[in-house]
């Protein structure tokens, strides 16, 4: 698999590449200059399972704020830089564990060298990021539009700029909102380089459409063994990105931990408020540290059979439900006690 052979990169106290676990990233949507709000959001993201956090650094005040933010958080901090090379330098001087730049908009080779020199001195990795919106005009013309081949050529051109300055502590990201083209770009670049890849579908959309596009895109890419860190980019609360990323990794067998809830679709045999019950179960289990499968079924006719592959499950009936464990019916429970009974079983799980 590609990710087993990618270069190992140290980001703060975490390692990516070389077969290390795929890490989940998100990005704050607070003003980085507002240390209190930014720290509060990062701590909440940490609690949800975020492994690496990125903050926008559009001003010198934001760059300087990183120093205080870094003191109060427990995961690696990435500074997102555009246009001004001095912000990249200031971010590193104030504790950034990694910087994200597009060498194409940083400026002259001298300015890029100034950034690379500080990164080299401090051992800070640089994420070289390109996306469809920043693709050079000559590459658009060469490939007759925005293409996977053009994105890959652009990314490698920028990598070569930094390599020529004697630095290879790099991560690459290629972002595009077109799922299939983004997948193709990752397939192409994974064949051409062994740098770790940060994977995501950019501008994926709202919670509904963004989750669908991200699940499909990341699923295609990750299932080929490509990708060392991921972000589910959503127009929504950053916490939702973490929930989705964890579920995608777990579904692909790339991360353990957390209860998986499965539930049947509603039909004419449903004898209980299955939609409400399934949602309550999913919310209830979020903070229970088990790695098991829980089934929520809508009737006592097919429920027990359909729940056999789950570790534990409940099936609703008329005023009464069943508690099922490892495919066996354990007991009947009054309908209004189903949720509490399931919770008690989970809290005492052995």
Predicted regions and their residues:
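Alpha-helix-loop-beta-strand connector modules within alpha/beta enzyme cores
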Residues: 60-81, 114-126, 188-197, 281-283
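Glycine-enriched alpha-helix->loop->beta-strand junction motifs that scaffold or abut catalytic
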Residues: 72-75, 92-99, 120-123, 190-196, ...
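N-terminal amphipathic alpha-helix/helix-capping segment at the start of soluble metabolic enzymes
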Residues: 1-27, 120, 283
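Glycine-rich, proline-tolerant flexible connector loops at the mouths of alpha/beta enzymes
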Residues: 29, 34-35, 46-69, 100-108, ...
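Hydrophobic or amphipathic alpha-helical targeting/insertion segments
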Residues: 86-127
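Catalytic alpha/beta core domains of metabolic enzymes, predominantly
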Residues: 131, 139-285
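Hydrophobic faces of well-ordered beta-strands that scaffold small-molecule active sites
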Residues: 22-28, 53-55, 77-81, 99-101, ...
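Active-site mouth loops of central-metabolism enzymes
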Residues: 19-37, 56, 75-83, 139-152, ...
């Amino acid at each position: 698999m590609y990710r087993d052979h990618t270069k190992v990169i140290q980001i703060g106290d975490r390692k990516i590449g070389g077969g290390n676990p795929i890490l989940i990233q998100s990005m704050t949507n607070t003003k980085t200059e507002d240390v209190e709000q930014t720290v509060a959001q990062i701590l909440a993201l940490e609690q949800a399972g975020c492994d690496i956090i990125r903050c926008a650094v559009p001003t010198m005040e934001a760059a300087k704020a990183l120093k205080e933010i870094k003191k109060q958080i427990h995961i690696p901090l990435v500074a997102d830089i555009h246009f001004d090379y001095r912000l990249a330098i200031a971010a590193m001087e104030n504790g950034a564990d990694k910087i994200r730049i597009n060498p194409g908009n940083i400026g002259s080779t001298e300015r890029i060298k100034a950034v690379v020199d500080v990164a080299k001195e401090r051992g800070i990795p640089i994420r070289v990021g390109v996306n469809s919106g920043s693709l050079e005009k000559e590459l658009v013309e060469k490939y007759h539009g925005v293409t996977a081949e053009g994105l890959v050529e652009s990314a490698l051109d920028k990598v070569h700029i930094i390599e020529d300055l004697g630095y290879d502590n790099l991560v690459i990201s290629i972002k595009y909102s077109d799922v299939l083209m983004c997948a193709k770009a990752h397939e192409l670049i994974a064949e051409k380089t062994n740098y770790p890849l940060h994977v995501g579908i950019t501008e994926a959309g709202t919670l509904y459409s963004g989750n669908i596009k991200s699940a499909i895109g990341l699923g295609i890419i990750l299932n080929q063994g490509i990708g060392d860190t991921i972000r589910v980019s959503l127009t929504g609360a950053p916490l939702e990105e973490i929930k989705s990323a964890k579920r995608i990794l777990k579904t692909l067998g790339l991360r353990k931990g957390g209860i998986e809830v499965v539930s049947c679709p509603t039909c004419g045999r449903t004898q209980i408020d299955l939609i409400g019950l399934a949602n309550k179960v999913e919310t209830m289990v979020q903070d229970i540290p088990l790695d098991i499968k829980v089934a929520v079924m809508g009737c006592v006719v097919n429920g027990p059979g359909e729940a056999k592959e789950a570790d534990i499950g409940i099936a609703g009936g008329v005023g009464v439900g069943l508690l099922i464990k490892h495919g066996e019916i354990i007991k009947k429970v009054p309908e209004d006690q189903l949720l509490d009974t399931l919770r008690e079983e989970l809290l005492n799980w052995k």
